[in-house]
Amino acid sequence: MKKAESAQWKIFIGPVEIAGIAGGLVSGFSKLGIYAEANFSYPYPFQSIPVVSHWIFNVWQLLGAARAHTSKSNLVRKVALVLLHNTWGWLIFIRSLPRFNAFFFLGGQTITNSNLELWLLKCLRKKIIFIYTGSDSRPPYIDGGRFPASSSRPSAKYLNTLTKRCKKKLGLHEKFADYLVNSPATAQFHKRHYINWFALGIPKLINSSNFYDKKTQDSVRIVHSPSSSGVKGTSVIIAALDRLRDKGFLIDWINIQGKPNSVVLDELSRCDFVVDQLYSDTPLATFATEAAFFGKPAVVGGYFASDVSSIISADEIPPSLFVLPELIESAIERMILDDSFRFELGQKAKQFVESTWTVELVAGRYLKLLENEIPDHWWRNPKDVSYVGGCGMPLSYAQLLISDLIKKFGVSALQVSDKPELEQAFVSLASEI
């Protein structure tokens, strides 16, 4: 499709921001001469691009903030705000219908979160693309974002309810969406073929030349920036660092939480490397991607480390030191000791993100979805999904949750009976307790 024809796309991106993805896509489409708006139903504290300033969107966010901050203990107020926020979503939807011909939905949410909305979009021939980022599609029983091991263990009944709800929601999306973008690590519930997340990438716009390396100390400077300490395994990482200090290593540990992105980027410019998280299902999540733009390598722990090379093609795997959680200490030690390895890995990561994951390049790949020009190798068959390690929790905790679910409601409660091999893998995992 010619550029002039491509420019006819008017894209809605929202209704939530996840790790700057919406903002990155808006910036990327802008560079391609395509109009896109990021509109959010809740305020996003780390917003890096200007969003549309209009009273109808401002009220939507105010209602969303009030809804989010109201406890369920204040039931009357909570119910009233939920109803008002959802109703206001219909005003946003009605306003958006004539303005956009493509809708990119993040976080597993839509403007009104209703069947009717998706049916209307389909009837009006709007392009619908769902972009999944983790907890919005991952089975709840292997999702540390929902159930960190540090929190109280959910009842099997509640877990069963959430699992059925997640599977049903994805089924609704599959019924109406033109395309589904997901990672093979979180596509266990899909029935339709989906687009491989790693083939598209994370859209990031970082000008590292605006920063400079101010590192002067002799110690090794390591940065960690968890959105949630429990989910990211921060306490285990700190314990590993303490043992390394006992060995005589000089370590300057920078732990950043709840700070503006500008503070994070400044620290990335000053560090030697980053430790992202302990239980990741991707070699390079958003924080590690930001570090890569500065040429700073990442140590990443996760059970997907043992599967990634057999599931993702080599040219799509972003460079990092991606290891099993139990190897996190030795990985950090290697990064401290081997200057050449650290520098080379950082440069490989920088080259990868600058040549593959820039906002313009990633937006260009999403444009191919809009124009139905999709390379065959982007497609993934959900029948091939094999990963059971989850994210954000130790495997031992996932085993407990899976076992609880099976004992109370049977194997079918896993909601993967359409994939017998995957179902058996979950059963085998639970039996190892």
Model-predicted segments: where are they?
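Short N-terminal targeting/anchoring amphipathic segment
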Residues: 10-15, 92-114, 129
